[in-house]
Amino acid sequence: MRFPGLAALTGLPLLILGVSPASADQCPRPESPIATDRPDVTNSSQVVPKGSFQSENGINVSQRDGGHAFDGTNSRLRLGVAPCLEVLVDLPTYVAAVDGPLSSGFTNVSPAIKWQISPNPGKIDLSATFGAGLPTGARAIVGPGAQPYVQFPWSWALNGDWSINGMVTDFFMPIDPVNKLTTETTFVLERELGKNAFAFVEYVGDYHLHGGPAYLINSGGGYHITPTQQIDFHLGVGLNNNAPAYIFGIGYSFRFDHLF
């Protein structure tokens, strides 16, 4: 299949939503409840507040290609450095093959920067993330070389407690001899359950430059123990042979405010 270029991916969400950058007083504040990039694949369309540090962590068990694996801690560290702007880093996660033909090893460390460009904060939110997986992990797990990516998570609050969310990501693998580009699209239907809990169902599609796509249905939920702490879970089921047969995970996230 044909993939849109970087310029098209950058411009399309902005044109559709009529985006102009959010002003500082419309950005997330320390009194805002925690908004995480987990447990769904789709990341939050909001950044962490300026002066706040957020840590998101989780473990998964999965089955694919006839083998079982465990991975953790899937840690993402996020720091609000300016209004509507954060820096983040995905720390190396260890993937342990339990049985079957799967490989074991660490994933890459992946720094990034995220900018919130909400055209209508609280109703329509959009962010742009630019990052790269640095070649620190096991090649059998993550593939060869540096892997830059661009990403656009968005959300739209509907009537009542419902919202729809989604994300488009382009992963570039310049020195991969076969697949130099993978595009991932997600779509989420989410519902708030009271003031502190939420549930979701999510579609995830990975489309490679060469080879067949992978389709996954993911569902789960989370609970805010406090306004700055969250526990969560998810269960994903693959829809074709290119996706994991299943993946189940749990997680815990927290945020510290007013650091500067």
Where are these regions (language model features)?
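N-terminal secretory signal peptides that target proteins for export/translocation
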Residues: 1-5
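Bacterial N-terminal signal peptides
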Residues: 7-18
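Transmembrane beta-barrel domains of Gram-negative outer membranes and organellar outer membranes
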Residues: 24-260
